[in-house]
Amino acid sequence: MIITTTDFIEGKKIRDYKGVVSKEAVIGVNIIRDVFAKVRDIVGGRSAAYEKELTNARNQILEELKEEARNLGANAVIGINFSYEMYQSMLLVSVWGTAVVVE
C-alpha cells in the first residue's frame, strides 16, 4: 500500500478513485498528572512520553487508514493530511486522504 502526501505518485497512473478515507484517535491528556509527574522526560521543552504517544497514535491510524483503503479495493492513498486538535484534556489525531487504484 502506497501512502503519500502528494496528489499523485510519480511513475504511476491513477486508474480509479475509490473515495475519501479517514481515521481518528483520541488520546487522554492529564497535564497535571502526566506532564508535571514526568518532568524528567522533558528535554528542551519536549516531552518524550507525549511524543511517543503521538507517534503510536499516528502509526495506528495510518494502519487503520490502509485497511479502510484496502476494503474499498484501493492500493494507494494520496493527498494524506494530518490534524492535531486539543479539546479539554483530550488530543484528537486525525488523518485523511483519497483511496485510489494505481498501476
Curated annotation (Swiss-Prot):
Signal peptide: none annotated. Pfam families: YbjQ_1 (PF01906). SUPFAM superfamilies: YbjQ-like. PANTHER family: UPF0145 PROTEIN YBJQ (PTHR34068:SF1). Belongs to the UPF0145 family. This is UPF0145 protein PERMA_0324. The lineage of its organism: Bacteria, Pseudomonadati, Aquificota, Aquificia, Aquificales.
